[in-house]
Every structure is written in structure tokens, then in C-alpha cells.
Amino acid sequence: MTNKNAYAQSGVDVEAGYEVVERIKKHVARTERAGVMGALGGFGGMFDLSKTGVKEPVLISGTDGVGTKLMLAIKYDKHDTIGQDCVAMCVNDIIAAGAEPLYFLDYVATGKNEPAKLEQVVAGVAEGCVQAGAALIGGETAEMPGMYGEDDYDLAGFAVGVAEKSQIIDGSKVVEGDVLLGLASSGLHSNGYSLVRRVFADYTGEEVLPELEGKKLKEVLLEPTRIYVKAVLPLIKEELVNGIAHITGGGFIENVPRMFADDLAAEIDESKVPVLPIFKALEKYGQIKHEEMFEIFNMGVGLMLAVSPENVERVKELLDEAVYEIGRIVKKENESVIIK
């Protein structure tokens, strides 16, 4: 018996691994940008920082996964957008610190290497990288029979970006009186899915609920996370933004205070929040307390900006999309987030 056959008998298909690498090369090629060095398949991805033109570069990194949204991708056998979710969760975090994404690495672990399915996953990662302007310079596909079921896989990513030292966004510039601007989310993004799956546990996904405006439930649940990089980078370059909050797990309550000092608070006008239909459906069918919704979900706002009043119109002009004035920064009395 050869070593190859012995490994195959243990459940690891080396040939399938080689096939995945060949399948994903064309997707990775879409993401190439200035600064990328070397070819796919090396022991480490390389990037030439001098190509960015940044005078005082500060590297900013982020890592994340997509949580149990993956379980719905597996359930509905739809794998071509979950990679975008993974990229979005990482790059939206680093853009909140003022970083331009440079490169991305992914990690996929599975019980059985199915090249066609994994190609779809990585194609989604590549699409996310294109939207973020980041190069996919490396990754790992691990086949682990016994650790995962044959149909199961997990996905994680790691993003690295760069910022001018003078343009880092760390919350220190946010002051009382700043206007809070909300940028629309595409849906649930990639948070709260353990609760979402419980609420819709008895649904097939084919249902068209009256609240969802003609869309199938599974389409809404797997809507890919919006990537805000190209919208927000011009604002950072012009130094128009004092603070940025990526609204992820923990909703408004946990994430908004991360962009300002402890002596400040965010006062939110709930009537200005563009609540999406899926959140109304979740509140109704899950019998979730209304105030708790803001502690879990983005409620239709995926990114929040703190902007000086005199810069609001210029920010709106550059964004060229619906921008929601949802509140302001005030002196903290009790709570860090006040929703009225």
C-alpha cells in the first residue's frame, strides 16, 4: 500500500486538494493589485508596502468568520456569496480604523474536500476582495475528516490594511455635537444567526413572507454583507470623518460606543433608522422585545459615521447614496447609547 492510498483511506483526498488550487487560480487573479509579490502557492504571501505611496504607514489588521450563517449556506446549498461575507466582516472592521485594505488570506476547513463547492466559496472570497480593493495573496484549505461532517465546512479570514499615521481613526476626534450618519446595510450581514436560525427553524427557506416584499426567505437570510471600503475611503482621505462604527454582533448598543471616549454618548432618533423588512419579520415571528433588537442586529445601518456638523454636506456629496442622519454625540449621563 502506498502512502497516498493510506492517506486516502483515512479520508484525505490529496488529489482533490490539488484540483481546488487549480480551480481557484482564475478567481485569485481577479484580485491582484499593486504591491503583490510572488505567485499563489508559496509558503507565504508577500506584499511590497512601498507601492502604496503612504508616507507614514501604520498597518491595521483584522480577522473574523461568518458565524452560523455558514449553517444556512450549507442547508440551502448556496456557497457563492458566503466568502464575500467573510471578507466584509474583516475589511469593514479595519476601515473603521481608517485603513485601506491591502491584502487578505482565507482559511477553509472541511470534512470532505469537494472541489466544485470550495471553488464557489473562494470565488465569493475573491469577489469580496475585488469590492474591497484587497489582493487575495494566500490561504489554507484543510480537509479534516472526523473533525467535521462531510458536508460541513468553516471559513475564516484575515485582512491587513494601511493608514497614514495622521489619518488613523481611533475615536479621539469625536466630540459633543458631532452628527451621526448611518449607511444602509444590505440585510442581516453576518451577525445574530444563532437567533435567526432558531426563529426560522421550521421554515424551508422557500417561503415568501409578507414582510419580505416578494423575496424568498432564504434569499434574504443569505444576502451578502455589504462592503463599505470604496464608499468610505474618500471620506478618510479628506479627513471628513471623526469616528466610524461597524455595526456587527451586539448591534447599536455594543458597537456604537467603540468609536468615542467614555465621557460621551450617542443619542439615536429611532424614527430616522431605515429598518429593513427582515428585522420587522424577526421581531414579529421571534417575539423579540423591540429594545432587544438594537442589542443584537444592525437594524438597517451597517456602518455609522461621526461627522462634524460643517462636514455633513460634503460627506453626503461624496457618498452619493442615501445617508441617514440618525443622531448626534452628547455628553454621557448614564447610558452610552440612548435610543429615542
Curated annotation (Swiss-Prot):
Pathway the protein acts in: Purine metabolism; IMP biosynthesis via de novo pathway; 5-amino-1-(5-phospho-D-ribosyl)imidazole from N(2)-formyl-N(1)-(5-phospho-D-ribosyl)glycinamide: step 2/2
GO cellular component: cytosol
Keyword terms: ATP-binding, Cytoplasm, Ligase, Nucleotide-binding, Purine biosynthesis
Entry superkingdom: Bacteria
Gene Ontology biological process terms in this record: 'de novo' IMP biosynthetic process; adenine biosynthetic process
Subcellular location per the Swiss-Prot or TrEMBL entry: Cytoplasm
Enzyme class per UniProt: ligase
Main location as per UniProt: cytoplasm
InterPro entries reported in the protein's UniProt record: PurM-like_C_dom, PurM-like_C_sf, PurM-like_N, PurM-like_N_sf, PurM_cligase
Family stated for the protein in its record: Belongs to the AIR synthase family.
Name this protein carries in UniProt: Phosphoribosylformylglycinamidine cyclo-ligase
Native species: Streptococcus pneumoniae (strain Taiwan19F-14)
